[in-house]
């Protein structure tokens, strides 16, 4: 029989390392309540510098409107009951503008959720940050803020990169409020569908599915890997969108394809499936990922990432969650079917505080 761990005997260096990974006052309170040694190791007024730097709002130089704009961070959290940590919910929060409170957002979009009137005792829950996303907003009439609704916004070190609505990549230095936005492009390729900061490097995805590397020192852009990802379905369906997703440490490319349907005399473009590709380093080509195993992809409007399905209520493994026409839908890679979340009888990981709507 193995010996029980004596928490008070853990070395101070390890406790300090653990404390530096905390991101909220609630986590700090729970950490310090374990034993006297833990309380002595970390002050109750500890600042979360890394978290604050990553999550703070930043004033940016004016974009096309000529009006003041800012970087607006949001974070995805996994919330579980401390008494039952095996399964949980996915929520999305950002700092409120005029107070120290948090504002609840719809998980798969940035729409604000009005207060439900519920009060949660956070000491009964364990909250873990799992992913970060960003938006760029501008100030207009009556001090109201609005989003530019860029296709993607990424913070890499102190540089803000965006893919605008015309599929152009721009960047500015968030530390210099008078820094002008600079366009990133190649002589041959000027339009892109996505960008990502992955393992310390900045990558861009062009409209053909080719990956490009962006230098953070010179801001040049260079092709990385094969010239494109497969497009073997283009004779039947239109590739509606292409996105990066980090999956098991690899950078995958997700193709979302659609088809036009005529409903009530109106042509409607609807998603009919997804294909996932990853780089085969030996073959130096992209190969299709037929199964996500026990993972699921979350394709939010401002960020895409993978989760371990069994850690969330009602989350189906080997599936892709996305939004369409103000509904949350799930695509199953196993049989290629698409289901509305509102039609599901299962408890949803998005339903902790809100209905399963965008």
Curated annotation (Swiss-Prot):
Pfam families, A to Z: Beta-prop_KIB1-4 (PF03478), F-box (PF00646)
| SUPFAM superfamilies per the UniProt record, alphabetical | F-box domain
Q: Which InterPro entries match?
A: F-box-like_dom_sf, F-box_dom, KIB1-4_b-propeller, SCF_F-box_domain
Pathway(s): Protein modification; protein ubiquitination
Signal peptide range equals: none
Keyword Coiled coil applies: no
GO terms under biological process: protein ubiquitination
Q: Which UniProt keywords apply?
A: Ubl conjugation pathway
Annotated F-box domain residues: 4-51
Q: Which SMART domains match?
A: FBOX
Give the function comment from the record: Component of SCF(ASK-cullin-F-box) E3 ubiquitin ligase complexes, which may mediate the ubiquitination and subsequent proteasomal degradation of target proteins.
Q: How does it assemble?
A: Part of a SCF (ASK-cullin-F-box) protein ligase complex.
Entry protein name = F-box protein At4g35733
Q: What is the lineage of its organism?
A: Eukaryota, Viridiplantae, Streptophyta, Embryophyta, Tracheophyta
């Amino acid at each position: 029989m193995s010996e029980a761990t004596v928490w008070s005997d853990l070395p101070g260096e390890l406790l300090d390392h653990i404390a530096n990974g905390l991101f909220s006052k609630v986590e700090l309170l729970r950490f310090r309540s374990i034993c006297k040694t833990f309380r002595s190791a970390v002050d109750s007024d500890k600042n979360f510098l890394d978290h604050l730097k990553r999550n703070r709002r930043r004033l940016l130089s004016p974009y096309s409107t000529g009006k003041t704009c800012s970087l607006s961070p949001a974070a995805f959290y996994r919330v579980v009951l401390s008494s039952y940590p095996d399964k949980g919910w996915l929520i999305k929060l950002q700092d409120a503008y005029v107070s120290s409170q948090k504002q609840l957002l719809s998980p798969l979009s940035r729409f604000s959720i009005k207060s439900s009137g519920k009060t949660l005792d956070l000491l009964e829950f364990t909250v873990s940050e799992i992913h970060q996303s960003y938006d760029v907003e501008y100030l207009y009439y009556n001090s109201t803020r609005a989003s530019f609704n860029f296709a993607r916004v990424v913070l890499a070190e102190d540089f803000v990169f965006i893919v605008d609505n015309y599929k152009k990549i721009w960047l500015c230095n968030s530390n210099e409020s008078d820094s002008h936005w600079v366009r990133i492009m190649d002589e041959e390729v000027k339009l892109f569908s996505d960008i990502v900061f992955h393992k310390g490097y900045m990558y861009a995805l062009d409209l053909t599915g080719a990956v490009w590397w962006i230098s953070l020192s010179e801001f040049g852009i260079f092709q990385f890997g094969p010239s494109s990802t497969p497009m073997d379905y283009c004779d039947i369906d239109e590739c509606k969108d292409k996105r990066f997703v980090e999956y098991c440490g690899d950078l995958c490319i997700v193709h979302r394809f659609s088809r036009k349907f005529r409903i009530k005399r109106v042509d409607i473009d609807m998603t009919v499936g997804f294909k996932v590709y990853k780089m085969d380093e030996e073959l130096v080509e992209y190969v299709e990922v037929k199964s996500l195993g026990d993972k699921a992809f979350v394709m939010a409007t401002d960020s895409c990432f993978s989760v371990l399905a069994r850690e969330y209520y009602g989350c189906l493994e080997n599936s892709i969650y996305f939004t369409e026409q103000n509904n949350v839908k799930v695509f199953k890679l196993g049989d290629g079917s698409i289901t509305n979340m509102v039609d599901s009888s299962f408890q949803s990981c998005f339903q902790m505080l809100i209905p399963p709507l965008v």
